């Protein structure tokens, strides 16, 4: 679906993205990184709005910069609110469909269908967009992105500025989109916004792609990084005494109130494999196990620290 080969984009002497090699099959992807990490530049390359300075971009085996036909297979919901204030959402979506060569009658039907899907009722879709709230503007942008039924939907910071209700509605829509078998790339600088949508993640920092894959695949990149595991139990001192002699344990600390221990392990998988036997053998009552790497935030924060030489 997406293939990038040694892609670099320069803005004068400034590097937008740097030597990205990437192959993505159809599916749902979260594009993650801080503001200025290169996410929007990458999206503009994928959608044919920018030409790479070096390397090649292929979407459905075509060059989106040079081959306009492939762009009909894409839907883009941009981050910016560049909307005509005196135009209604219906007029906006219909006009963009007409630009694709769809006749006026069919474009009107497709526009109304898309506006139905995103939840803009008859009254709101026929009001000037200058009167819209941020959430309504996002719905209008989303409607134009899906009206032509694209194979790949790309959204740049779609949750930005939305209230909790609108965020929930956006999440539900994207979950339904993925469930229907269509592909999506969702850009965000906030991890939890895409956790309920994407199965695979791409992490960018300073124009570079630090890692990509499923949560499990990315976690495997950190196999040699010590992790903290919290074990809650009824006798923390006894548990600490057992753990301190194990090869996979680097250190053990007892929680306040003797309610459990914090274990620092260089091989968390071995720790988890052996733990049931230790509990049985020493008659320990462990009530809860919690690992730091259960959080995607921890995984991505750790990758960033590795890239910056802090680990």
Regions found by a protein language model. Name each.
Residues 47:
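Helix-to-loop junction immediately C-terminal to a conserved catalytic motif
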Residues 55-70:
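Conserved ABC transporter NBD signature motif
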Residues 94, 98, 106-124:
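Conserved ABC ATPase "signature" region
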Residues 128-135:
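Conserved ABC ATPase signature
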Residues 153-157:
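Catalytic Walker B motif of ABC-type/P-loop ATPase nucleotide-binding domains
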Residues 171-263:
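ABC transporter nucleotide-binding domain
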């Amino acid at each position: 679906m997406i293939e990038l080969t040694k892609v670099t984009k320069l803005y004068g002497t400034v590097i937008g993205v740097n030597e990205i090699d990437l192959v993505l099959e159809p599916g749902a992807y979260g594009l993650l990184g801080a503001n200025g990490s290169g996410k929007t530049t990458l999206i503009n390359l994928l959608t044919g709005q920018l030409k790479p300075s070096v390397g090649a971009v292929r979407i459905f085996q075509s060059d989106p910069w040079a081959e306009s036909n492939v762009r009909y297979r894409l839907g883009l919901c941009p981050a910016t609110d560049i909307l005509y204030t005196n135009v209604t959402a219906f007029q906006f979506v219909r006009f963009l469909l007409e630009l694709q060569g769809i006749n006026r009658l069919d474009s009107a039907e497709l526009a109304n269908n898309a506006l139905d899907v995103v939840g803009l009722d008859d009254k709101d879709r026929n009001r000037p967009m200058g009167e819209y709230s941020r959430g309504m503007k996002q719905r209008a942008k989303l409607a134009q992105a899906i009206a032509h039924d694209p194979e790949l939907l790309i959204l740049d910071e779609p949750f930005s500025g939305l209230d909790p209700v609108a965020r929930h509605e956006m999440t539900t829509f994207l979950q339904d989109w993925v469930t229907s078998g269509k592909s999506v790339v969702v850009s965000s600088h906030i991890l939890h916004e895409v956790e309920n949508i994407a199965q695979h993640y791409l992490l960018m920092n300073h124009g570079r792609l630090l890692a990509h894959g499923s949560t499990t695949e990315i976690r495997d990149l950190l196999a040699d990084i010590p992790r903290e595991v919290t074990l809650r139990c009824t006798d923390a001192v006894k548990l600490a005494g057992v753990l301190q002699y194990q090869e996979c344990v680097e250190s053990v600390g007892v929680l306040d109130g003797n309610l459990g221990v914090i274990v620092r392990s260089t091989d968390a998988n071995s720790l988890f494999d052996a733990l049931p036997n230790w509990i049985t053998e020493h008659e320990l009552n462990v009530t809860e196990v919690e690992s730091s790497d259960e959080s995607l935030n921890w995984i991505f924060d750790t990758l960033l620290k590795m890239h910056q030489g802090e680990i």
